[in-house]
From Swiss-Prot:
Induction (free text): Targeted to degradation in stigma upon (-)-germacrene D perception by KAI2IA, probably through the formation of an E3 SCF ubiquitin ligase complex (ASK-cullin-F-box) containing MAX2A or MAX2B and KAI2IA recognizing SMAX1A.
Protein name, entry field: Protein SUPPRESSOR OF MAX2 1A
UniProt keyword terms in alphabetical order: Hydrolase, Repeat, Transcription, Transcription regulation
Residues spanned by motif EAR: 537-541
Stored InterPro entries: ATPase_AAA_core (IPR003959), P-loop_NTPase (IPR027417), SL_signaling_regulator (IPR051650)
Family in the record: Belongs to the ClpA/ClpB family.
Gene: SMAX1A
GO molecular function, one term: ATP hydrolysis activity
Function in brief: Probable component of a transcriptional corepressor complex that acts downstream of MAX2 to negatively regulate karrikins/strigolactone responses. Involved in the (-)-germacrene D signaling pathway influencing plant fitness and occurring in the stigma in a KAI2IA-dependent manner.
Residue numbers spanned by region Disordered: 248-283
Pfam families, alphabetized: AAA_2, NBD_SMAX1
PANTHER family attached to this UniProt entry: CHAPERONE PROTEIN CLPD, CHLOROPLASTIC, PROTEIN SUPPRESSOR OF MAX2 1
Amino acid sequence: MISEIGKAAVAEMGILLARFREDHNKLWLIGTATCETYLRCQVYHSTMENDWDLQAVPIASRSPHPGIFPRLGNERILGSSMEPLNPLKSFTGSVPVLSSRGPGNLNPRLRKSCCPQCTEKFEQELAKLVSEFANQSSEDKSESPRPQLPQWLQNAKLNNDSKVTALSQSKDQALLQQKTQELQKKWNDTCLQLHPNFQQNIGPERTVSPALCMPGLYNPNLLLRQPLQPKLQPSKNLGVSLQLNTTQMASKPQEKAASPPGSPVRTDLVLGPKQTETTPEKTLEDQAKDFLSRISSVPQNKFLDKFASALDADTFKRLLKGLMEKAWWQQDAASSVASAVSRCRLGNGRQRGGAPKGDIWLLFSGPDRFAKRKMASVLAEQFCGNSPIMICLGSRRDDEESDLGFRGKTALDRIAEAVRRNPVSVIMLEDIDEANVLIRGSIKRAMDRGKLTDSHGREISLGNVIFILTGNWSTMSPESYRNEYLMEEKKLVSLASSNWQLRLSLGEKSAKRRASWLHDEDRPTRPRKELNLGLAFDLNEAADVEDYRTDGSHNSSDLTVDHEEEPGLENRRFAIASVPHDLVSSVDDTIPFKLIEFSFARREIKKTISKKFSMVVDDKVSIEVEDDIVDRILGGLWRGQTSLEQWVEKVLGPSFDQLQPRLSTLDENAVVRLQLELYTALKGQSNGECLPSKVTIVADGQVMSTTS
């Protein structure tokens, strides 16, 4: 709409100019516009300047002084009496040229801080620098031939040029001042390295502040020396840095030492209240102790080591607590992950090409992929404040969602894109044992070089990314046990994926058969076998018969408590030899994950629920949890992101509180049962969680309420 109006206005103005030109009349139009508006007009109306015979004149940002422009004259638009304030031809000034020695504008400490040789070389370079600035200024001010302009345009242009020239002159002066200070600092450092003896001789004199007698290039910083304060950084190099700082502080000459007898200066000029010194000079050890809060009983190096260890312990405890809350059935793996990450984050001497290494590579090997994901989520939440990035290098599983945004991209492209978007993140590369040779080779080179190359040949630095490689390298024997474990895993996943809700009901205690997983774990003492004393013993019987006992036990003793390991348990341990050697040698640490002890997990679930119930309700009333409910809760905890304690506190806790007043009137035979709610096909879990968020309370066959 605006473009059409502009085109119409331009066309009408062109017609008006053409009409006046036919009668040999003159039409003057004066208008103002911003630079952006004028450029936009040139883009949309390229022939506007020729059609209107426009002559663009820049206008200064600040209005001129009153009285400069007189009233309109008869001969010219602005009259002929106005003269340029600062004619361009009469402007011959440039950046003030400093003298070759420059004693007035130089830092007066230079002569004391540099030897005569370095001072002479500094003055030579300074003279050369000043001459270069003068030549550059004269070249910039040389005028190029311009077409003749009307007098009023020349006056406006000269006024604008004078202001631009003054601005450029001030910029040149500031730039020359900066270059001079940099040159002075350069020769101070050079003299300190080449002539250390001269610096030591003038050391006591350098602490005296010179009198600032004349303004110039010299602009000293604060005269007071800033107090040395340690910066607490979570790094194992903290102790070393503190020791270096205290050593440098103590190795400096005594600044407040008495002046020599022949010195005319006998006072120290400082800003602030003067501190009275009544104690003698302290030794290096005493100064270090004062710096570390007056520690007298513990040596300095031991305190620094203990301080760094305290930072390590704090990081380790916080991380271990988060890992144990989310994956409490993998206690050994959680402890190993916390130790490895804390050690890598604090340096641990990890270097790549002589520089500290920022990225971290961990290898999670073994089964239980859901526990690996939970630990990756804890790492991302505590160190990065976001969720981990999951990239599958193998075949996609049924329970995983496909990301349409990465369709058509290789795994390396997805990794590079994730690093490019967020260089401080946690990236989990799942199923690296199923990746092809090219992907594994590229990841191996990224570990060694610290840069990842995508499919287009572009390299990207890994930054401070925590990479987690996962693989199912483990040995499970016999094969029947492996199949049994996989079936149990699929069962839990299936139960957790279905829609289900919970119900709390009141009833009386009844004899109930113990769960099968309780019989397996809490077996009684093995009874003595009935031995047939009349049975002949054949010494020629084959000695390699493996199972010669009737009960199928590998224990040859008949009088033992049943604490022997279950068949195949010794083969469930992670075998490090099965992992490729190139991955083990390249990653920062390898963490083995064990098979899930389902019986242990079930016991922990019942124990946690019973503990919460006993805290709310009287001990005379007990709670019973059905076996099917325990399996469903285990599957939901395994797949979801909620921890067991959080779910019990948030969902079951309010239900127990609501049930507590009614239980106070019941006898000891009363029992509360946690059961599966029937007819819940239309009810689902909230927020995509695998655990129910509501509990229905039923008493005497009637629904009391539903809590959430």
